[in-house]
A protein has these predicted regions:
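Secondary-structure boundary/capping micro-motif
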Residues: 1-298
Length: 298
């Protein structure tokens, strides 16, 4: 445990946490797979180093009691680095939902089941490339075929989240980097990697409602939007832990164009996308604005 720095009297940073508690591709000397807790703070749009925490867990101690104790230790470490406790933590594994909820509740931290954990997944991919292969007991390939992922059929968006009108839009990446200066209501902004082309167009969706824009934005934020994707001729919004929402049906040409735009942004700009909510197309204020990432599932 890291002792608090007595000179650090001001906790000037706060962010949500992104958490994964699961086994890793490493066999311990006792023949059991390694379990590990990973925590990353959600980065602010302005950048800066995130808070990160990694801790191994003996396979026989995988329970909410151990996890709550580890969370307390993570809170102590975060305080020593000048971080206030998080208001909420996000966790994306359905299999671990109950355990994480119990541990978070013990520390009075709200747990949000959500795949909107972009920073954590980036870190997990980094560890899979650079850390685990160097460990003794590393399993270079699965010992058995991985289970097929459960796909949730898309259902129509709730009435409260449907705009009166919608349209496709693109914004240059450099413009998105300035989104923190825009007049925003509900929002979820992401940092922009400085090495990417600022002129690269980012695809997105604009929703309009002259009378319900603010309420619509509030509902949409509660869904925890993750990414837009094309399935056949349908525009799908993946959200939350495993939700898929049907936004609209497209004609063949529209579906092809959207698929191309999403593929291009995956290749060049980390899969960045956006959803905007406005009263009218001419209103400069966004009642809601979320940056999304079409990121590979870990």
């Amino acid at each position: 445990m890291i002792a608090a720095n007595p000179l650090a009297t001001t906790l000037d940073r706060q962010a949500d946490w992104e958490l994964d508690f699961y086994s890793r591709p490493i066999l311990e000397p006792d023949g059991k797979k390694r379990w590990e807790l990973l925590i990353s703070s959600t980065p602010c749009p302005e950048g800066g180093d995130p808070f990160r925490y990694a801790r191994r867990c003996p396979a026989g101690d995988v329970n909410s009691t151990w996890l709550a104790s580890a969370l307390r230790d993570a809170l102590t470490n975060a305080e020593a680095e000048g971080w206030r406790p998080p208001r909420r933590l996000r966790s994306w594994r359905s299999a671990m939902r109950t355990m994480v909820q119990r541990a978070a509740a013990e520390l009075q931290i709200e747990m949000v089941p959500s795949r909107r954990t972009y920073a954590l997944i980036d870190w997990m991919e980094e560890r899979s490339r650079e850390v685990y292969p160097k460990e003794e007991g590393y399993m270079a390939g699965p010992l058995a075929p991985p289970p097929a992922p459960l796909s949730t059929p898309a259902v129509p968006l709730p009435e409260a989240v449907r705009g009166d009108a919608w349209t496709w839009a693109t914004l240059p990446l450099g413009s998105l980097a300035e989104a923190g200066e825009w007049p925003l209501g509900f929002n979820g902004l992401l940092p922009i990697h400085p090495g990417m082309d600022p002129d690269q167009p980012i695809p997105g969706l604009r929703l309009f409602s002259p009378t319900r824009a603010l309420a619509l934005a509030g509902w949409l934020g509660g869904l925890e939007p993750v990414r837009l994707r094309i399935d056949g001729r349908q525009l799908i919004l993946d959200a939350g832990q495993d939700d898929s929402w049907l936004v609209t049906d497209l004609d063949a040409e529209g579906a092809k164009a959207a698929h191309h735009a999403f593929t291009t942004t995956r290749q060049h700009t980390q899969g960045l996308q956006f959803i905007a909510v406005q009263t009218t197309p001419d209103n400069p204020r966004f009642e809601g604005f979320w940056m999304l990432r079409d990121q590979p599932d870990p």
